[in-house]
């Protein structure tokens, strides 16, 4: 790796001094995203439904030489969202990056799906993206700069039996992403989405080997992705050199969906 390439890599991947918020940032993909951003010099707010978990992750990331705050946040609650963003403004004075990662599943076949299961998934997965993005653009518009990255899913494009609520919520994120990208491009704000496929998590770890093998047969690259695979895509979209990319969905699925 020559010196000029090393310098280029440092330039696009060093966001020192920027401020980011990652929702659902204490586990899995969200935790990996928060870690990658902290490694690049981003001061962070890690938001999660459990205050203790948020504080624990924040403490672990502070050793990267950045300031990281852990905050309790139910993304479906407008008052809590406003409070977290206001505390972020008071602490850091700006918001450059928002990663809307918080999400839940409440699976069930359509005929058996309860209305409260539908509503809960929509409230967290889709309404939460709306509420957080609405707050973020207030700061980003004034700065004439911002990066919003929404975590959707391969299920938004392929569907998945038993996940009508989840798939619909993630498909809604795609439409939301494209619309907000058009609205705020003139303000220097880019809005993109990342759509993970099958990713190695605690959930997939407990699957029987034969089920994993069947799932891998659907993936041309022949393996599950890692949380770092997803985090790297998010970090790129958050970087200054991704400034001409907006309204796009980056698929991280090993070729499962093309």
Where are these regions (language model features)?
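Residue(s) in the substrate-gating loop at a strand-loop-helix junction
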Residues: 153
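Alpha-helical segment proximal to the catalytic Tyr-Lys
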Residues: 138, 182-186, 243
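Active-site helix of classical SDR
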Residues: 133, 169, 177
């Amino acid at each position: 790796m020559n010196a000029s390439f090393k310098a280029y890599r440092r330039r696009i991947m060093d966001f020192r001094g920027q401020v980011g918020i990652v929702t659902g940032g204490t586990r899995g993909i969200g935790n990996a995203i928060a870690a990658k951003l902290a490694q690049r010099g981003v001061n962070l707010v890690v938001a999660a439904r459990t205050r203790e978990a948020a504080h624990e992750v924040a403490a672990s990331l502070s050793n990267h030489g950045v300031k990281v705050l852990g905050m309790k946040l139910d993304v479906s609650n407008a008052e809590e969202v406003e409070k977290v963003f206001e505390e972020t403004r008071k602490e850091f004075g700006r918001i450059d990056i928002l990663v809307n990662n918080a999400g839940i599943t409440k699976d069930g076949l359509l005929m058996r799906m309860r209305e409260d299961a539908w509503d809960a998934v929509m409230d967290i997965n889709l309404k939460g993206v709306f509420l957080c993005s609405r707050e973020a653009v207030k700061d980003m518009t004034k700065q004439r700069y911002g990066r919003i990255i929404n975590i959707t899913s391969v299920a938004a494009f392929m569907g998945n039996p038993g996940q009508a609520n989840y798939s619909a919520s993630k498909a809604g994120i795609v439409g939301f992403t494209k619309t907000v990208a058009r609205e705020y491009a003139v303000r220097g704000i880019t809005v993109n989405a990342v759509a993970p496929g099958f990713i190695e998590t605690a959930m997939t770890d407990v699957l029987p080997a034969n089920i994993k093998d069947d799932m891998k047969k659907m993936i041309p690259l022949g393996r599950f992705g890692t949380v770092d695979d997803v985090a790297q895509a998010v970090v790129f979209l958050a970087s200054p050199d991704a400034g001409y990319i907006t309204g796009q969905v980056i698929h991280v699925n090993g070729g499962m969906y093309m």
